[in-house]
Swiss-Prot record:
GO molecular function, one term: tRNA binding
Reported function: RNaseP catalyzes the removal of the 5'-leader sequence from pre-tRNA to produce the mature 5'-terminus. It can also cleave other RNA substrates such as 4.5S RNA. The protein component plays an auxiliary but essential role in vivo by binding to the 5'-leader sequence and broadening the substrate specificity of the ribozyme.
Sequence similarity: Belongs to the RnpA family.
Organism from which the protein derives: Streptococcus agalactiae serotype III (strain NEM316)
EC number(s) per entry: 3.1.26.5
Cross-referenced Pfam families: Ribonuclease_P
InterPro entries: Ribosomal_Su5_D2-typ_SF, Ribsml_uS5_D2-typ_fold_subgr, RNase_P, RNase_P_CS
PROSITE patterns per the UniProt record, alphabetical: RIBONUCLEASE_P (PS00648)
Self-association state and partner proteins as the record states: Consists of a catalytic RNA component (M1 or rnpB) and a protein subunit.
Gene Ontology CC entries for this record: ribonuclease P complex
Name of this chain's protein: Ribonuclease P protein component
Organism lineage string: Bacteria, Bacillati, Bacillota, Bacilli, Lactobacillales
Length: 109
C-alpha cells in the first residue's frame, strides 16, 4: 500500500478517534472520518495481546490485502481498523468476510 493511502501520524489517529464515528462487529472496530481528499487513507492497529510480532504483522498484511482488493469501492474517508481478539485464528476468507461486513455497516463500501 502506498504511503499516500496510510494514516501514520499520531495527530491524524487522534483526530479520527476524537472527531470520527465508529462501528464494530465481533472481530473489528472501525473509526472513520470524512476528509476532502482524492482517496481513502487507512491506519491499522493490532494489539500486542493478539500475538507476537509475526502474528500481528500477518494480520496487518491480510487487512491491507483486503483493503487493496476493495480499493475502487472504498469511499474517500480516513479510517482506522482495529483488530479484536480472535482475528488471529481466522483464515483469509473469514477475515475478508468480517472486514467487508463492518465496512458495509460503516457505509465505507
Amino acid at each position: 500500500m502506498k504511503k499516500t493511502y496510510r494514516v501514520k501520524s499520531d495527530k491524524d489517529f487522534q483526530m479520527i478517534f476524537s472527531r470520527g464515528k465508529n462501528v464494530a462487529n465481533r472481530k473489528f472496530v472501525i473509526y472513520y472520518l470524512e476528509k476532502e481528499q482524492k482517496h481513502f487513507r487507512v491506519g491499522i492497529s493490532v494489539s500486542k495481546k493478539l500475538g507476537n510480532a509475526v502474528v500481528r504483522n500477518a494480520i496487518k498484511r491480510k487487512i491491507r490485502h483486503v483493503l487493496l482488493s476493495q480499493k475502487t469501492a472504498l469511499q474517500d474517508y480516513d479510517f482506522v481498523v482495529i483488530a479484536r481478539k480472535g482475528v488471529e485464528e481466522l483464515n483469509y476468507q473469514a477475515l475478508e468476510k468480517n472486514l467487508i461486513h463492518v465496512l458495509k455497516i460503516a457505509g465505507l463500501i
